[in-house]
Amino acid sequence: MGIDSTLSVLDISGSGLSAERIRMNVIANNIANANATETPEGGPYRREQVEFSSVLNRTMQKSNVKGTERLGGVKVQRILKSTEPFNRVYIPGHPKADAKGFVEMPNVSVMMEMVDLVTATRSYEANLAVINSSKEMNNRALSIIGK
């Protein structure tokens, strides 16, 4: 494995770590606001989701003056607010209840957020394992060269 490919592996996996960290923060924010009936914007909290996009690296090759594109990792494209309707829950006496006793609650399912959190955690761990494997291979290669 050459130095360029080693750095590429670290860059790609590092971008995955950063993206999954942001995703986990967004999920934690969703869980923390699962019962927030009032936000500064007005109305209940809206669930947020992370949208990823792939990053392309442009590389120049001697035989190809125009260069080539190859995958170079992932980045957070944007954080989207859900357009799903709010949950209406019957809670008479709640300060935000309408005349019939219903309160608009955030469109957050804590169970789904926990599933997403496990998925994000596993992706984070996979990227970390790739980085650790790459470092281990490089250390072994250096020890072979040093003998």
Stretches found by the model and what they are:
Residues 1-147:
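Amphipathic alpha-helical polymerization modules
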